[in-house]
Amino acid sequence: MEQPPSTSTGIGDVGQNEPITAVFLLNIDRHTGPLLAGWVESGNRIGAIVVPGFRRRPTSFSVGNVRRRLQRKRLLKRYLGNSEVRLIEFGKPYDWDALRRQLSGIDADVLISYAFPILLPQDVLAGFRKGGLNLHPALLPNYRGPHPVHRLVVDGQHAVHGGVTLHRMSAGYDEGDILAQVAFSEADWVSRQSLAHSTATAFSMLVSGAVPAYCRGAVSGMPQPAGEFIWAELEPAHMIVLPTMPIEHVARLWRLLGTVPGIYLSMAGGNVRLGFQIRRLGPPTGQAPIRRWARVEFDLADGRVVHWKYSRLLKRLAKVRGLLAPARVAEPHLEMRLFGRSE
């Protein structure tokens, strides 16, 4: 997959027939790989990809870091073919001056970010003609913050505020003008696989469609309304299963949060981490939870159930089960909504 040649765009909007050069600030994974491919396939250029630096920087040779770099190369090969892409590792402690120097030779129109944990300095964003854009996995202004997907599932609001927003980056967390959104339905949340597929599809739609429209002046965006909105930060209490919860809600918690970060049941002696449900026994009994070897039996709002207790063995079994009988992932029927379209 060849990238088009670089073209100087001048100040302001990008010309209709000129490719757009973007710097991406994101990890390369199953969510972001398709958007990178879609960006290049639509005739645009990748100036550089700024990827997270490794959490630990060993003083000697690290097999783990070599493995992670090889995995990153395989993903780039899978999604971008033989395209030459510049990778910049950027991690704590964040040296913004050093990053500016590395980006100074790239004539980029826009910065596109996903899941970067801190605010970018305004002078960094000012280095791009069209500033910085961020992909947020919820329908803003609802569920701003670092853990929107987790909180949407915990709060049972996934079918109401679930989706992806493309917004301008500003001096506040997730507060910039909204350029475009893709809403999810209940069907997009039936499994981790379906959510990942829908998210990747939405990312690709927004980056391939809304970003060029914004850079060429066809979309200006809409300011976010003022008001009090839920700050999406996951607390330990959000991972506790309560007897007032319906069985289906707990099943969804397990499907989407069970392996990371986990869900727990409070029992005498401490919290027990839950695995997936084995069976439903019948209506609630009013009895306390019972621990039986690798299982735990407890009441929920609409029935008494038995779950496996979470363990390393269960984690492996769940992975094998997913490989042998993967969840069916239907092609999502998603629509993109643009804000502030020019006439």
What are these regions (language model features)?
Residues 21-22, 110, 114-229:
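Donor/substrate-binding cores of folate-linked one-carbon enzymes
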Residues 13-15, 26-35, 40, 107-110, ...:
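Hydrophobic N-terminal alpha-helices or hydrophobic patches in metabolic proteins across all domains
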Residues 25-29, 92, 311:
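Structural motif
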Residues 223-343:
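Internal anion-binding site segments
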Residues 64-91, 312-313:
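Conserved nucleotide-sugar phosphate-binding/catalytic loop shared by glycosyltransferases and other
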Residues 33, 73, 93-100, 146:
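Structural motif corresponding to alpha-helix initiation and N-cap regions
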Residues 2-70:
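N-terminal Rossmann-like dinucleotide-binding module
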Residues 48-50, 86-106, 111, 119-137:
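Internal alpha/beta domain cores that form substrate/cofactor-binding pockets in large enzymes
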